[in-house]
Amino acid sequence: MLFRSYISVATGEIFGAWVDLRPGESFGQVYTTRLDPSRAIFVPRGVGNSFQALEDGTAYTYLVNAHWSLEQKKTYTFVNLADPDLGIEWPIPLSECELSEADKAHPMLKDAKPMAPRRTMVTGCNGQLGRAVRRYVEEHGLEGFEFNDIDTFDFSDPAQYDRFDWSLYGAIINCGAYTAVDKAETLEGRAAAWKANAQGPALLARVAAEHNITLVHVSSDYVFDGTHELHDETETFAPLGVYGQSKAAGDLSVANCPRHYILRSSWVIGEGHNFVRTMKTLSDRVANGELAQVTVVDDQYGRLTFTSDMAEAIFHLLDTGAEYGTYNLTSEGESASWYEIARTVFNLANHNGDKVQPVTTAEYYANASGPVSPRPEHSTLELTKIEGTGYIPANWEGKLEKYLNM
């Protein structure tokens, strides 16, 4: 059966035979029994189902979690119920039964394909984290993944959800978000931030709850006001700006989904535009004589989070079946200011860290032409909880050096 089903008999009696077609050690195991109105049986997804009616007028019923569709049929797997290797002792010889041509054509157990796992949908696949997740999937040869960005599935649009048969999906990894922190303080940006960061996750959480899907969602240090030097997963939200407020709202929605992982990160570095790449470019320009020096804020403290580590941590939680909930995830190591990280990048790139000068956040944005979102002073996240699952984050300084050498 593709579906999970609850089978009962209203009248009469049947002989039922079930073959486990799920991948793993139980593949090919057979279970048989007789059912009458006094008994019922639950059949998990991926277990082949067959029966014989033993009395005239037998009524045999299914309660299923999904219905047949052409898309569903593409995921079916079969085994031939006449295969002697199954050892099924049919009360009525199969030679006396009516079998469809499809039943007769089903493969023997030795040729049967294991039931494929439910699909995993990745949203926001073209962002920094989305690209890291895709790369992880490709490098590990994982199957059953579907990658979407806003052009193929805008998860913040309620009208787009009916396009999918959600019973086919076992997990959603939401890598999409609105991350223009300062632009979120504008009229246009505020609406966009709330649509992507609050409404979108709420819609994903609803569909995940309705279809028993595990939802993976990424949070931000901006849900806190930064007054505590170290933030654990139990700290109360106190976002300072619109971006942080919209992310906090999304977190609250996802937390109501029974099967969820929220990974809270800070200072994300991956493929594409980010702070480290900007500092590397500026270091090169200083080395080439195009710039004399640069200024970087020295009153915000935290740790970098590399998207390659985020992807590994996501699959670690999914694969190990860790307890659902919220997990902080950054690189480990001493907290540092943006200024200290910039000096490290300059020294690694061109040994010119002395050309980075410290400045306060207020001084840095003193001449800004547009709105500026308030930033948390302290963004360092406590990592004890995720380490308790067996995932040990890498040191940010070592990861930074490897990142610059890629």
Identify the residue ranges that each predicted region occupies:
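Active-site region of the double-stranded beta-helix
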Residues: M1-D36, Q52-P117, Y301
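C-terminal amphipathic/interface module of NAD(P)-dependent oxidoreductases
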Residues: P93-R118, P374-M406
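NAD(P)-dependent short-chain dehydrogenase/reductase
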Residues: L252-G302, S308-D309, F315
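Mid/C-terminal beta-alpha module of Rossmann-like enzyme folds, strongest
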Residues: A313, T320-G370
